[in-house]
Every structure is written in C-alpha cells, then in structure tokens.
Design a protein with these regions (language model features):
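Alpha-helical transmembrane segments and their immediate juxtamembrane cytosolic regions
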Residues: 1-233
C-alpha cells in the first residue's frame, strides 16, 4: 500500500498534534509526559515553512503574513500559556518562523556557500537563545535543516536524522526512557515527523482561500478556544 501525503495532509497532521500538545499544557500541566504526543508537530511545521519559502510566488507577502500573525498571536500566547501580558521570556512560535525566514533569505543570498551557511546555522542558535523564541536555540536550526538538506537523497535523509536527533537531545524535555545513565527526552519523538515528511509528494493537495486562511488563523484561534473551554467547563 502506497501512501501519498500532500501539503494539506502534512498541515492537518501537524495541527492535530499541536492541538493535543496545547490541550495537555492547559488542561493538565506543562511538564506532563503526554506532551510527547505532540513532539512531531514542530518539525512538520518547520518543513512546511522551508517548503513554502521555496515555492511561494511572493516572499514579501509571505513574510508580511507571518509578521502580522506573530504580532496578533503574541498577547494570546502570553496570556493563555503564561497568564501575563506581556511575557518577555518566551515568544510565540511564529516569531521563530520569522527569524528562520530571514536566515533562509541570508543563505540564499550567499548561494549556500558551505562555510557561510554553517556560520549562519550556528549563529541562528545564538539568536534563538537571545530572543527567547519558542523552541529557543533549536527552532531556527530545525527549519534550516529542511532548507539546506531539501532534496530526497540518502545523504540528506541521514543529515536530517542526525541533526534532528542532536537538536532534540539539546532541547531536552521530559524523560521518555533511559539508556544506562543517559536520559532520553521526549523531544526525541520529533524524529517521527520524518515519516510523513518523507512520504510527502511535493503536491499541495486540497487548497483554496478558505484553507489558506485556516492555516494562519488556526494558531491563535485554537489557543483561545482551548483556554475558554478550560475556564468554563
């Protein structure tokens, strides 16, 4: 049986996993092991951003849409997850994507020069740490991994597995299991995202203006809905 996954289905998978993650945070607790279910969501969104960067017809408009979404989502993100507006110690994930967008633009301008690209890759970890964006110092590099190692070759697949494993171990999280004295965090489940990503056909799939804006509006909207349900039910 052959599975053909389009961009539409990648979005749906990531949205479902992200929603589960946020339900656990809001209804149970931030440090609950059930959050492991949602770990593959971010790598899928990271891949979709890199793919969108390649395929969009108008990068300026793409960037502006992300910027507006980041600004609109921030007070919602701050209040729902931190009960404080403003909360300066963690910015929502759309800001992570904005900075990754800038990093990809820089890499494109240097024609993917290996040395300069490597410098940008590691510099992005510092930027992520200093700006306190969601996913901290691994967020931007995760997007860049899919941008730099885009083609479906064996070497690129090995690179994706290796880098995502390292980034996941660096970020940590709740202990999923132990290997001797080594604690393996639940972030390692981010690797599962590679299954639907590798099955991606390169096609957009179901798409229209309603779906386009659903992708953008869902992020702040689902936070509001989950929060309201948690307060009144």
């Amino acid at each position: 049986m052959k599975f053909n996954i389009t961009s539409f289905w990648l979005h749906i998978i990531a949205i479902i996993l992200m929603t589960i993650d946020h339900i656990v945070i809001i209804f149970i607790e931030n440090e609950n092991i059930l959050r492991a279910i949602g770990r593959p969501a971010f790598p899928i969104f990271a891949f979709l951003l890199a793919e969108g960067f390649y395929k969009t017809k108008n990068r300026k408009n793409y960037f502006i849409r992300l910027l507006i979404l980041a600004i609109v989502s921030e007070p919602i993100f701050d209040y729902v997850l931190h009960q404080k507006i403003p909360y300066w110690f963690q910015q929502n994930v759309i800001f992570t994507f904005l900075l990754a967008f800038c990093a990809m633009t820089l890499i494109e301008k240097i024609n993917k020069d290996r040395i300069k690209t490597t410098i940008i890759f590691f510099a992005s970890m510092i930027v992520g740490f200093l700006t306190m964006i969601d996913y901290n110092y691994i967020g931007i590099p995760m997007v860049l991994t899919f941008y730099i190692f885009k083609e479906k070759t064996k070497l690129n697949l090995i690179a994706q597995i290796s880098i995502i494993t390292i980034l996941s171990l660096l970020l940590g999280g709740q202990t999923l299991f132990t290997l001797g004295q080594i604690k393996i965090p639940d972030e390692i489940l981010s690797l599962l995202a590679l299954i639907p990503i590798w099955l991606y056909t390169g096609k957009q799939g179901l798409y229209n203006q309603w779906i386009k804006y659903f992708y953008y509006d869902f992020y702040p909207a689902h936070l509001v809905i989950i929060y309201l349900v948690s307060r009144f039910f």
